[in-house]
Every structure is written in C-alpha cells, then in structure tokens.
Amino acid sequence: MDKKTTLEMIAAISNANGTSGFEDEVVAAIRPYAEGLGEITEDRMRNLYIRRKENNGKRPVVQLDAHSDEVGFMVQAICPNGTLRIIQLGGWVNHNIPAHKVLVRNRFGEYIPGLTASKPPHFMTEQERKAPLDMKDITVDVGAVSKEEAMEKFGIRIGEPVVPDVTFTYSETTDLMVGKSFDCRLGCAAILKTMHNLAGQELNVDIVGACAAQEEVGVRGATVTAQVIKPDIAIVFEGCPADDTCVEPYMVQTAIKRGPMLRHIDARMITNPRYQRYALDLAEKLGIPVQDAVRSAGATNGAAIHLTEKAVPVIVIGVPVRYAHTHYGISAYADFDNAVKLACEILKRLDEEQIRSF
C-alpha cells in the first residue's frame, strides 16, 4: 500500500463518526480497505475481524488489535431553551470541551451541526469565573430555541451520540497529520497497512486483525474479541498521548517524530518483559526508531487481551498523538509508518518456539 493510498485510508477512517457504542460508520469506512485481505466478519457489538486468507489454522495465532471508537458524548437531556445536556463517552478534561464544533446524530441518522458551549464571561459572577468548569455547565447548542423545536424540527432525542466536527488534513511540507480520533483510528489503519504489506507472504503464524468497539469506556470490545480469536500472542496498536509539549525534557518518552512508543507498564497492564525486550532489540537492530515509556496512567485493549485464557503476551505499539482525548490531534506520518514497519518485522520472525520463549 503506497503512501497516497495510506493517507486516503487514514482520512476516511479518521473522518468517520463513531463514539463508543456507535461504531457502525467506522466499520463501514474500514471495510473497503480490508477487501482482499481475507475473511471479514462483524459481531453484534460491531467488533470487526479480518482473518488473513493465508491462515491455515495450524499455526500460532497473532491478534492485531486497535479500537474503532473515539471519545465523544451522549445527549442526556434536552433543556427547555433547546440546548442539550451531555455526558462524556471516554475521558475528557472539562475545560477542553467548550467552544468547538460538534455533530449531533438525530433519530433519523442525520448529523446536526452544533457548538459545545458554556456561560459567556459577560454573564458570569466573579466566583463563577474562578470556579472549575463542571460538566453540568457545558451544553451543546444546535440553534434550537425550545425543547420542542430540538425534538420536532431537529429530530434530536436523548441517547444520541455527539462527536467532534473535524476533518482530516495532511501537510506534505511538514509530513504531519491533523484530525480527530487518531486514538485509535491510526491503530485501525496500522492493522490494515500491516496486513496489506504482508499479503501473500508465507509466515509461521496466523494473523487476525480486530478493530474493537468501546475501548474508551472500559476495553469492552477487546474483552469479546480476545475470547473469539483466542490469540497466542498479540500486538496492540494505539494512538498514544504525546508528552513532548507538557512535561520536563528529561521526562519526555512519547514525542512526535521520534518513532512509535512501546510502554513497559500502564494502569492496567505490565507488558510482558521478554516480548517487550524482543521488540525493542529488533527495532534497534533494524534501525527502526522507537521510544519506550513507563506510564502510571491510561490503558489499552492490552488490559483485556493479556488476561485471556492462560495469559497472552502483548506489546503495545503506539503512534504518538499530541492532544489526544480532545477535539483535535497532531501526529507524524513517519511515526505511523515506523509502527507498521516494526509490526511487520516482528510478524515475519514469530514462530511457535519464539512465542513460547516469552
């Protein structure tokens, strides 16, 4: 898959609207790029499985994982003045939410443009200006003037999803990508590009790609996919939060333009140290730039996959994303490309004996 096609794929998947529990549009965007790779199936949770056509069922199984959902919101109530109360789907910081364009899906599946809003400073007391912003003080304004208009003219009901209204862009000058949902649509794209790059090659493992739903609300999709696939080993792709603009220089472990990040630990998984060392050493040997990190917070689908059956060795190959879990992200294409390169090189070398050594 060449770079032009890869960027078109990333754009299509990034632009698709799909917060947790509402991944249908994302799955539909992924499917065309999975054609020809093998058997494509879905379950009732909207987890998408891509079983490599070269699989023979007699070799160890590698699960390639990424999650398809994005952080977003759900309409909780419609106020008498027509604005919408919302709850978070996934982890947001409240002060990052207001003053952005969003799309509200209505009962007919149409997307209604709106703005995330909070009380303007002109009408705030001094105490309100100094107080932390509470979620109950953030609304979505679609321009309705009453609850009745929001429901009847706009077709909005409670329980509908709300997503950032952002369109993917890429700069040839900087080789940077800007868009929404890079956590983890870059991971979904990495699965597809990895499988395309290995198409037709004889490997010593079977590969199943899984784009899992509902990661942002508790790795729920991966809990299912791991039970279905029953992997012997796994690679989790993630759009991981970059730290190069927000910590002391000596603490930077996830910078853009320095390669993918492999974490030793996060809040819900200690990475298999033997598998982790194998991946880091292989990257060094092949000259693939990588970063390794120790994380005290956050988690990935590895949290569910590594606890499957008798335990599964998992590494996380993360593409750094500045400002993850906001409306926008910035990522370097080279980091994405090197994440795919590392995954391909690992998969070319894995066999039953190597997997047992982990």
Kindly give the residue locations of the regions a language model identified:
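N-terminal hydrophobic/helix-forming segments and targeting peptides
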Residues: M1-F358
